[in-house]
Amino acid sequence: MINEYNVLYDVNDIPKINVLRSYKDAPKDNTSILSQLKYLESKTNLKDLAYEQVYILSHNINQRIKGFMCVGSGDYDHCDIFFRNIGMFLLLSGAEMATIVHNHPEDVREQSTDDEDLTQKFSTVCDMFNIKNCGSYIISRSGITQIPLGVFYDWRFIK
């Protein structure tokens, strides 16, 4: 079973993840990133949305989906992404691997500098919690594009 989550806060501002929906129809090849992205697209209809949304996929050590959550939304010029929620979701869902996915509503497959910045920040969050980063992807009507991880700073050696 695969769950779709959101983060809720109680009266003391303590976070917990809440199950929005549960899906029993996991993808046939649940360890293939491509089949997982197509599965996410079928559940969220990402490629047809008129606005941009950012999702996190949580995986176990065998790279099977544990769950997913929307962590940001916006339009082409600006997207509000809540990195606090990303960290909480990864920790509270028990993620051992994670993937970040977003859509481009204007059917643009090329990555922007903001997409590269998102990929870098997500990689930093994964490194902080010792979670393997499975990549960053863009879903559009034209197809799926992977954003290369590139060369990022190793913050442990910067003084």
Where do the model's predicted regions map?
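Extended substrate/RNA-proximal surfaces in nucleic-acid metabolism proteins
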Residues: 32
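Mobile, glycine- and charge-enriched loop segments
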Residues: 36-79
